[in-house]
Amino acid sequence: MIIYKNVDYGIYAYQIGFFKVKRIGEIVWSDHYDSKNEKFSLRIEGFYVAEERRRHGLGRKLLNKTIKQNLNENYPYMIVYPKTFGEKILKDNETLYRIYEHLGFYFTEEMVDRTKADNEMRYDFIVKKKRRKFLYRTNFFSYL
C-alpha cells in the first residue's frame, strides 16, 4: 500500500491504495478562512475508508499524514465541513459523529443568528514545544 498526494485547484488529497489501481482510503481538505477569528484553518471536505478496510487504522494514518504536513503552516485547528453536521444528518447517522470523535475531533456549536446555530467538528492542533538544551562548551581559545 502506498499513500500518494493529489492536488487540484486548491483542494488537496491523500489517497491510500494499491499502486493507484484500487483506492481504499482518501482524505480531502482545503484552506478555510474563519472571518470571526480572522485566521485560516484546514477544512476536511471528504474522508473515506473502504468498508472492508475499516478498523485497521487507515483513517488514523491518513489523518496523521495530513496533520504532519500542515503543522508547519501554522493552522490553529482543523474542522469538518459544517454542512456534514446538520441536525438532520446527526440524528440519522450517529456513527459519523462517533468516528470523528474517536479520531480526536470535538463538536462545537456557535450561534450565527438568534435562530440559526453553526455546527462543526473541530480538531485543535496542539504543538508541544520541546525544551531546548543548551550545551555549555568551554572556549577553545582559553586553552591556548
Go through each PLM region and give its residues.
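Conserved GNAT acetyl-CoA-binding A-motif
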Residues: N70-D92
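Positively charged N-terminal leader segments that act as targeting/secretion signals
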Residues: K130-K133, R137-N139
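GNAT/GCN5-related N-acetyltransferase fold signature
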Residues: W29-S30, V49
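Conserved active-site alpha-helix within GNAT-family acetyltransferase domains
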Residues: T84-E109
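Conserved acetyl-CoA-binding loop-helix of GNAT-fold acetyltransferases
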Residues: V49, R55-Q69
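Short glycine/proline-centered loop/turn elements that form peptide/ligand docking sites
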Residues: L63, N93-I99, V112-N119
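Conserved acetyl-CoA binding element of GNAT-fold acetyltransferases
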Residues: E38-E51
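Conserved beta-hairpin
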Residues: I2-I27
